[in-house]
Amino acid sequence: MKKLLLLSAFVILSCQDKKIDSTFDFDQKNYSEAFQLIEFWLEAQKDYDNLPGLTAMIADQDGMVWSDAFGMQNENEEMNIENTFSICSISKLFTSIAIMRLVEEGKIKLDDPIEKLLPWFNIDNEFKESKPITIQSILTHSSGLPRESNHPYWSYPEFSFPSKQEVIEELKNQQMLYPSSKYYQYSNLGLSLLGYVVEEVSGDSFDDYITKNILEPLLM
């Protein structure tokens, strides 16, 4: 029903009695009607997906041209454009770029075993015929590692993401799912380990490395 109402609203707004100006300069930054549609759609999408709140922005080559916040950040406060969110798996993009930068600089190789770079790595591997768990096998989600670290951080809001030390301590209680480089298995644990590789090899914290080598050069 909500999708039908949303579609109807778009049709009504699109069919308003307007003359089309064939001389319109598409370089003009007059996006007010588009922004109105975006705001309406985001508000409806928030309700349809039962989201408590969200923020959104649009930017072009000259900077931000539109932003807005919708819903609540908690029971008493409305969302605002300054609210921050965990980017979760988007961090895999930055991790992969950082790893490939270190490869290009000759500091690591794609076929380096993870044990070479993280001496504390000690997961139980019953597959004696398994190939080494390499940087490449982790990047391609074919390492044989479990999907998650041994923590319930997806279970309830009060469970935060595990610290590096917690990941290290729990590795010995986890097992490989299959021999490395044999099957595909999405692994958040694997990409977390590559984040630790970035720290070990560069000497910087993950946040500092990403900021200095990716975000700042891109003026982000």
Regions found by a protein language model. Name each.
Residues 38, 65, 116, 155-179, ...:
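Short, charged, amphipathic alpha-helices and their helix-cap/turn boundaries
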Residues 86-90, 104-146, 150, 173, ...:
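Active-site helix/loop module of the DD-peptidase/beta-lactamase fold
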Residues 29-87, 120-123, 169-174:
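Short, conserved catalytic-motif segment at the N-terminal edge
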